[in-house]
Amino acid sequence: MKRTAERFRRDLRTLGISGQAIDAVWPSWWSEEAEHSNSAQVELRFTVARRLGLSPKSLLGDEEPTFVWKHEAKFKGLSTYGSKEQAALSSFGISLARILSKGVRATFDGRVIGLDPLRLRGTLLKTSPFVRLQDICAASWGLGIPVIHLRVFPLSAKHMVAMAVRHGDHFAILVGKDAKYPAPTAYHVAHELGHIVNGHLPPNAALVDLSEPLEEKSLDSEEVEADSFALRLLTGQASPQIEFNQAPANGAVLAAAVMRASAPSRIEPGTLAMCYGYQASDWATTHAALARIYERPDDVWRFLNRIATRELDWEAYSDDEADYLRAVMGGVELA
């Protein structure tokens, strides 16, 4: 085979694939000895193709590798990515959904499409004081929709909040934006779930939110529907209104107010603070309030991926597939 493994890596970099992503998709069984085996070279290319969403045929010759899902994506928000980067991002996400689906224990039920967020909220409130990030994740996994936080990003520059992806009849929610407090991520996951429930994804497609949906106040109809779903799930209202006699002077005042209001409203305090930020376009006060609402900042990605580690049936994967998924999830264990 004319293309060496090192040249293959360089060709992948020319597509915009990050070195971190190439390391993650590279099979753990690869060795210097494999370099001299034609069958190993072919298997290397098929493995990388499956994980990045590349056409296997394009990897066997000397032409530039091409993505299978070039145009099967919707990008919401201001994009700094060119067509090649968009193809890489959507193909990576769709391929990851395919691999994840092997270990998702719950079978996706088509009746999820059109699910009423108020009905889901009512179900969750039977066992929780309000709808929290862990409740949304539990519901999503229970519906057969895995949720993970990407610790390996396919592109060198990460400009993505989250994406909903579909491979055949399998869906997944992939979060990209880091957070230190759970409320913003709860909204992101609920928003992507809204895209899925509202039928915004045809088979083998990705919907990528590049900008912060709440802060953008988009007029895009699909974004409006996903926002409405998320807000009704989290708060019970499509347009929650937070009333003050006068605007909170600082984050401490806002934090105290939403913590008092959370129990009677059955809305998580951080979510209430974010509702104020959305309503008043005052995100500085909102972020200051979040720092007071929660005991301490924490890496929310670890929380999401610990849930995923528990939920996935690891016996469904080969050792190499399991190594790949753990790399994508940041190597999180149950501890």
Question: Where are each of the predicted segments found?
Answer:
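Active-site hotspot residues in diverse enzymes, especially metal/ion-binding acidic/histidine motifs
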Residues: 1-335
